[in-house]
Amino acid sequence: MNALTAVQNNAVDSGQDYSGFTLIPSAQSPRLLELTFTEQTTKQFLEQVAEWPVQALEYKSFLRFRVGKILDDLCANQLQPLLLKTLLNRAEGALLINAVGVDDVAQADEMVKLATAVAHLIGRSNFDAMSGQYYARFVVKNVDNSDSYLRQPHRVMELHNDGTYVEEITDYVLMMKIDEQNMQGGNSLLLHLDDWEHLEHYFRHPLARRPMRFAAPPSKNVSKDVFHPVFDVDQQGRPVMRYIDQFVQPKDFEEGVWLSELSDAIETSKGILSVPVPVGKFLLINNLFWLHGRDRFTAHPDLRRELMRQRGYFAYATHHYQTHQ
């Protein structure tokens, strides 16, 4: 399959009944699947992991895999292979995940446990320097004075990949909605590389493989610059990206103009999906061929949104960047 192959209908294994969860295509795209844990599965999972507070998962990293096994066992061991199959499938690579009954900020710790279990069935979440943990929770409010667009509510946060300014491989990104008050707008934005109509033009450009400098602002707690190209290929030679407009530092006029044109071509793509993510749900995407961002919010003095993210590497395949590790 080449980079521009049309979506193959995987039929979401439409005839298959899963134990402990359901799986359907999303309303936005057949590439994005919706996975919902049943009320019984959710209840049993939370009961079985109740002995471990979130702090235990922070201090003892092996417990993150333990809670993952508990969740997979409750799903008759069908969950882990389904997650891996979906995320490693170039035609899909994205899930919107929900657990029935987990939908209130009072259940924030339960949300962290659930997301941790899912993430550690596919790999391991990296250390997040911004929070000092394997996950980060942060709040978006009506007024923001931070040093990046992460928390700024009244503008679009442009499409990007995570992990651009760190040396660790970032195969997946998980983004969970923990709380939302007085919110209008702010949908998640997603773009699959193969749905980007300008991919071939920019992937074939001479600057596509030139190593460029990426530097993070102070809030990220990362002081070392990293160098890598915007584009690379996976094991099958298909395009993957490692790009964010805020942190790439062009060294000259040629790079600056090309990056500016690249940004415009991404932001105006007709392939962008707008995905609402209610409280308690989370997106889990393949970071190599999905870009993500956020639409703007409608201003409100008491606007509040709390998010949780995890990002890490796949432990069951080597679909990494091939030429610049």
From Swiss-Prot:
Broad EC category: oxidoreductase
SUPFAM superfamilies tied to this protein: Clavaminate synthase-like
Binding, Fe cation: H160, D162, H292
Cofactor(s) essential for the protein: Fe(2+)
Highest taxon listed in the record's lineage: Bacteria
Annotated pathway: Amino-acid degradation
Catalyzed reaction equations: glutarate + 2-oxoglutarate + O2 = (S)-2-hydroxyglutarate + succinate + CO2
Co-factor note (free text): Binds 1 Fe(2+) ion per subunit.
Record-listed E.C. numbers: 1.14.11.64
Keyword check for Oxidoreductase: yes
Pfam families for the chain: CsiD
Gene Ontology biological process terms from the UniProt entry: L-lysine catabolic process
GO MF terms held by the record: ferrous iron binding; glutarate dioxygenase activity; oxidoreductase activity, acting on paired donors, with incorporation or reduction of molecular oxygen, with 2-oxoglutarate as one donor, and the other dehydrogenated
Keywords from the UniProt entry: Dioxygenase, Iron, Metal-binding, Oxidoreductase
Family, as annotated: Belongs to the glutarate hydroxylase family.
Summary of subunit composition and partner proteins: Homotetramer.
HAMAP family xref list: glutarate_hydroxylase
Protein task: Acts as an alpha-ketoglutarate-dependent dioxygenase catalyzing hydroxylation of glutarate (GA) to L-2-hydroxyglutarate (L2HG). Functions in a L-lysine degradation pathway that proceeds via cadaverine, glutarate and L-2-hydroxyglutarate.
Stated name of the protein: Glutarate 2-hydroxylase
Species this protein is from: Escherichia fergusonii (strain ATCC 35469 / DSM 13698 / CCUG 18766 / IAM 14443 / JCM 21226 / LMG 7866 / NBRC 102419 / NCTC 12128 / CDC 0568-73)
This protein's encoding gene: glaH
